[in-house]
Structures are given as C-alpha cells and as structure tokens.
A protein has these predicted regions:
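Short, conserved "switch-loop" micro-motifs in signal-transduction and mechanochemical regulators
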Residues: 84-85
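Active-site beta3 strand of CheY-like receiver
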Residues: 46-52
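Acidic catalytic/metal-coordinating carboxylates
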Residues: 35-38, 61-64
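Two-component/phosphorelay signaling modules centered on CheY-like receiver
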Residues: 12-31
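Receiver (REC) domain active-site loop signature in two-component systems and cognate sites
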Residues: 57
Length: 120
C-alpha cells in the first residue's frame, strides 16, 4: 500500500527538497500545504499516514496545527521540523504528541530514517 504523506512548510523549496527525497525512495503519494491552516483542512479531508510539518509558519503555526490534528485524530503520526533547534519547542511538540523532531538543516538520510521508522 502506498503510504500518504502530508508535507507542511511555508517554504516551497523545503517542500520540494523533502518531496524529492521521498519520491526517489519510493514514497510517491505526497500532498503539500503551505501553512498550518491548510495542513489541518488537508489532514481532515485526507487522513494521511504521516504529517511532516514545520513549526514557524504564517496563519497557523505548526504547534497550533499539531494540537488541532491530534484533537481531531489522536492516532495521527506527526513529525515536526524547524530551523529553531530550541529545546522548549522540541519538548512542547513531543508533549503534544509529535513522534519526532527534525532540526533544519537536515540530511536526506535523516528524513528517510524517520519516515521509515514510522511507516514501515
């Protein structure tokens, strides 16, 4: 079964970078959202197998979107990404139910390792 992944980042180049990493490694069912608001509505409609989400975004932050997605679906699998490697953000995201936290800049192997650990 082709796992469905939602990429959420306000930076189009970052979504493209992650998408390219995933598609070249067999993950081809990928949806995208440019902010937390779109992420919540897309997750609600699509119930993806995994969400990879930035923290700092306009309209609705990744933390706010994480709260809403987990309230809607407590079993949702969410991995947070951020350039801010701040311990408080990591702790908050994990407390809210994020399965992992990836600090940017990251290597492609880190994304793949995390996705495989969660989906395979």
């Amino acid at each position: 079964m082709d796992k469905k992944i939602l990429l959420v980042d306000d930076a189009a180049f970052m979504r493209m970078l992650i998408r390219n990493t995933l598609t070249t490694n067999g993950y081809t069912n990928i949806l995208e959202a440019a902010d937390g608001e779109i992420a919540v509505s897309t997750y609600s409609a699509e119930k993806t197998d995994l969400v990879i989400m930035d923290i700092t975004m306009p309209n609705k932050t990744g933390i706010e979107a994480l709260k809403e997605i987990k309230a809607m679906d407590p079993g949702a699998k969410v991995v947070m990404c951020s350039a801010m490697g701040q311990e408080a953000m990591v702790v908050e995201a994990i407390k809210l139910g994020a399965l992992d936290f990836i600090v940017k800049p990251f290597k492609a192997e880190r994304i793949l390792q995390t996705v495989k650990k969660i989906l395979d």
